[in-house]
Amino acid sequence: LKKIALIRFGLVLSFCIFCFACASERAELKKNDVSSITFTFSGDIMAHDINFNMKDYSLIYKDVKEILDNDDLSFGNMEMPVCDDLPLSSFPSFNVHADYLKAAIEGGFDVFAFANNHTNDKGIKGIDGTVKSFANLKSEYGTKNRKIFCSGLKEKSGEEFKANLIEKKDWKILFLSVTEILNSHDTSKNRLYYSAPTVEGRKKLLETIKKMRAETPCDVFILALHLFEAEYGLKVSNEKKEWFRKLAEAGIDIVWAHHPHVVQEWEITEIEREEKNGFLEGRNNGAGSIDKTNVKKRRCVFMYSMGNFISGQRWGKYIKYENPGQYFQYTGDSVLMQVRLTKIGGILSDEIILTPILITAYSGNDAPVVKRFTKEWIDTLPEKEKKYFLKRFELMEKYLPINPVKTPPSL
């Protein structure tokens, strides 16, 4: 009996050791699990009369749809109300109908920023219409197992800003759309995520961001920011760079900015922020200073201005074939910025890969459409257009860091 008992004990012990070894192996595998996600960011999706009078909106997206369909999430800034109860209208007071927004979704966009200076062009009625249009499309695509998201509008006045938590694969993404500029300061401004570009306004926004990050743990926090600054400027001011750093130190990982209608440079910047286990801690040492034991170095992506994705700003008489370097010509060229992030063992890695894809608005027989801006495409054009777009391509290459950027995986 003792012999049998010893055998049984040995078997149980062996089984326990085996289970422990398996559990340890699973834990080690989980620790080394690698998960990547790819975002695509565009410039402004605008709608001048030449755009919304198109017979087939899908043509806008045809040449880049494959790019937008083959990432994890594509982000677009809708720079107009979307209200079916109001007529279509162009600059300076925009409005489109839901089919224009639907075409963007069909074209591959998943996440929309609605906070900008044109969102309240049509007052409360325009905002109500936009909320309704998006809700209807969200419901429609929900039945097709397609999720779409937005930020920047309030259901009613007095609501606090709410970041949208997006779950994709095993990633948690916090998304917030904010504007610092308005065209209309009537009561409809209270339905937008508006942050005044003042010292106090920006201080309040930083506090809001810190609170959001603390209350909703996430892997990455993305801010769509419509900036209070002059249009058509190609250079980034030191003041703007400092503002973006403060946003990152408060908890933002990717700042995706708009308003100038032309592309400005982008960069990966290293900052320090107060964190605990990857999330913001926000504690001090009791003496009024930050406890440095929890300060972490982080790499953040700053897109200072993404220009226009589609518009009617460079079309017809506004195309200066004889002067490709004229300032307004830059409104027709932009990039799709792909950002690839990686987690290792559930922790965000320092490695970031930026892949800018040059695009241009090309006026075909009907209206401007988005084209991949390559020398191969330029070679297919008639001589007059070929000369113009080749010079535009050279100008874009000259001032933008258009080659892919890859940071080393460790600091």
Roles of regions detected by a PLM:
Residues 108-111, 238-335:
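Conserved beta-sheet core of the metallophosphoesterase superfamily
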Residues 71-83, 115-117, 209-234:
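Short acidic, glycine-rich surface-loop motifs adjacent to enzyme active sites
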Residues 32-36, 46-51, 216, 276, ...:
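A short C-terminal boundary segment appended to hydrolase-like catalytic domains
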